[in-house]
Amino acid sequence: MKERRKDLLWEMALVLLTVTACLYSTGVGNIFGAKVDWSSQHSVFPEYFRQQFYRTGQFFPEFALNIGGGQNIYNFSYYGLFSPVVLIGYLLPNVKMSDYMMVASIVCLAAAVIILYRWLKSREFTAVVSGMTALMFLFAGPMIYQSSHQIMFVNYMPFLCLTFLGIDRYFEQKKSGLLIGGTFLMIMTSFYFSIGGILALGLYGIYRYARTKERAEEMITVKGFLGDGLRFAGRILTAIMLAGVLLVPTAMALLGRSGSRGEKTDLWQLLTPQINLEKFLYGAYGPGLSCLMLIILLTGLFYKKAYEKILSLGCLVVLTVPFFSYLLNGALYIRPKSLIPFLPLLCYLTAKYLEKLKNQKIGRIWMLLPCLAVVIYIYLKKDDMKSEVLWKLLLLDAVITLLICVAQAYSAWIRKYLTVAVLGPVILSLIITGSYSWEKSGNLESRKAYEEDTSRSIGKAVDKAIASDGGFYRVEQVGNEEKNAENLNRVWNSEQYITSLYSSSYNADYQNFRKNDFQVEQPYRNFLMQSVSQNPVFRQLMGVKYLISSQNIPGYEKKWMTGGGDVYCNENAAPIAYETDQTMSEAEYDRLDFPYNQLVFTRYAVTKDGTVSAGQVKEKLAEDIEKCDFRIPEKNNGISLVVSTENGYQVKMKKKQEFEVAVPEQEEKDGVLFVQFRIENKKPKEDIEISLEGERNKLSSIQHVYYNRNTVFTYAVGLEKGQKTVRLSLGKGEYTIKDMSAYNGVLNEDTGLYQSVFRVDKEQTKGNLIQGRIKSQKDGMFITSIPFDKGFEMTIDGVKVKCEKVNKAFLGFHLEAGKHKIRILYHAPGVTAGKILTGLGVLIVIAGAVRKKKCAE
């Protein structure tokens, strides 16, 4: 009873500390959520999943028509499509999902800390050892930080810790439920990090197996090990099968993403052990423990028990040999984030080390040598570390550990308080480095900005635009680049469709079209961030008829003023689906240069076989645009240096500065200015950004994780009637602008391209189904601005037809003259196979339960 009271006090203290630490980390006036990644991905995608569930009632969705033009929803499964944490939020329709996700993240963190404590206590560690180790786990680099940033990095931890308990239960009581259930929930919460989690579970499983055999005084034979190992692996495999409905279609979606880019690596680099102190220790993107962890792993190699040595060696190899990090990151890159799932296992090894140290079961030589080795290693790595402060902290940490280890060998008093003496400084150093990381990043969302971004008044403006129009068009929210970043995936209404997307997985054709074919501006340093475009031609092509904005937008007419922003309308925007016979072939399109490669979409659809040549297109478009001068004013004032060269400009800016550039006057109506040039970065480790009339292009540092390779800056900016100048903002840096071309013109309002408009059935169009009618005046092509995917199934009047890629990246098919009922159904590749696999997993679980019941009888 006394022990249970002590446990309860520890658990209450751990929960209180967790909540306090999370709230303290937000600072003054902020929320427990970060800008960009959290606000535009980890809180927004769950809201969209819930929104689609309410609209369709489908628990297993397949298509996300609303985001990124319309994509396989398993491109976004990483963000919690079937996560039990997210699914609970479905039961709270009146609570903003972003509010729920903040609370859920703190609850998950507290649950993980408590379960870890209970697991350690169940392994017969003292309450002090278990509690202090749980505190170390709480303050480890990624735990609090990622709970408000990249929540998928850590929100699976309760289920992972639960599964470690399940392994103990499996070997001690021969019960599989907790092992299978915990693994299944971990996968469903974060399939990406579950791979590392399963590897950690496997290592611990081997350790527990050997220890169980030793206690039972049984010999381990090769045959017995293989047989028992297969039975254990069978439980893990059953959990994987249960998650088949998530894993199979997600794998198919990832395999279809041919546009993914990985780091170049060689075999020697992958197999050579490396310890990057700044990434491996303390950081939020790795296990994030102190240098004590290195000491413990090295000391473990000298333990007496073979299985204890194997566990330490296994962890050391996985953590230091880049091959494992590379493999756990899907063979894309070598980054320590995939090693975060080893954190609970490292905490177990810490508790084990403290127990042995206190009971003097580690020889003095084997206790001191690892400490000395780590101190020397850290000292020698001084020049390799970017932060001298962190180097000093690491060295101090290692020296303190060395001194405590020496002192406890001679002092019974220190041995009595050994856990506090060893882990106290470690926890303090984790808190200090954690606070430093929070302060340095400074990217938490302010409460004021959060309330503005999630204000229902914006949603009401979107609702009004949709309700006013019975057609099939897109409605987008536009602000400055920071606001646009927050709203990359935000959808307010299940009938709102947007072109933007920010996801680690995406439709490769759509991404390639934006970047290489059409050459949309890239305002962000991360190539995955596909922003709303300010290009009026792209907006017209993609059917962006309505914009919600607080600024006047050339080419759009203000319709209404609302509390959430003004509603602007462009009556000339293309429908999302229409029929036309004005076509040109892909081969001819590929011959077009800028800006004809963009303007062609105002007059023609690009198909496999077209009717006009590139020359004819240029001749036709010459009616709308003409080449013009675009001269940047030269300047040399000590802060800004802009000098013209034979082929462009040499620029050296100490800070961002704005210039006024003359352009041909728009005499009759709003027009468009097209500008394109190449950029050569003289300081490639720094970013470059240049804006024209607020439309920004950015070239990221070559060292950036998601380097965007944006070396050609392309602009198409709207000009108002009578406008004679434009604002050009040159960002800080040293670079060359060359091969510049500029054109000025108007967008022709009557090109006859949209000959027959698809009338969508808004009641039937939801989930993975698009349905409606069209009255085609003549034979032609049915054109959409929905990205092409092999999962589409099309029927005309109930007859299945073959779909093809049109406009280089979108869905289309041949259509004969007449009245037709169109039905477009999307089947995510792998969904059926995934459901079958899940069904087999359920049958295996049921069969196992029945068999166990019969054996018990």
Sequence positions of predicted segments:
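Active-site-proximal, structured, solvent-exposed surfaces of multi-pass membrane proteins
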Residues: 2-4, 45-46, 626-857
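Transmembrane signal-anchor helices characteristic of membrane glycosylation enzymes that use polyprenol
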Residues: 6-39, 44, 237-249, 428-430
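Membrane-interfacial loop-to-transmembrane alpha-helix junctions, especially the N-terminal start
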Residues: 7-10, 123-132, 169, 174-179, ...
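Membrane-embedded helix bundles of polyisoprenyl
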Residues: 15-19, 105-119, 127-211, 231-251, ...
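Membrane-interface coil-to-helix junctions
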Residues: 18-113, 135-157, 196, 254-259, ...
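Extracytoplasmic/lumenal acceptor-recognition loop(s) of multi-pass membrane glycoenzymes
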Residues: 69, 78, 425-449, 466-540, ...
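Contiguous transmembrane helix-bundle modules in multi-pass membrane proteins
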Residues: 193, 307-320, 327-455, 819-857
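Periplasmic/ER-lumenal interhelical loops and adjacent helix-loop junctions
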Residues: 224-340, 382-389
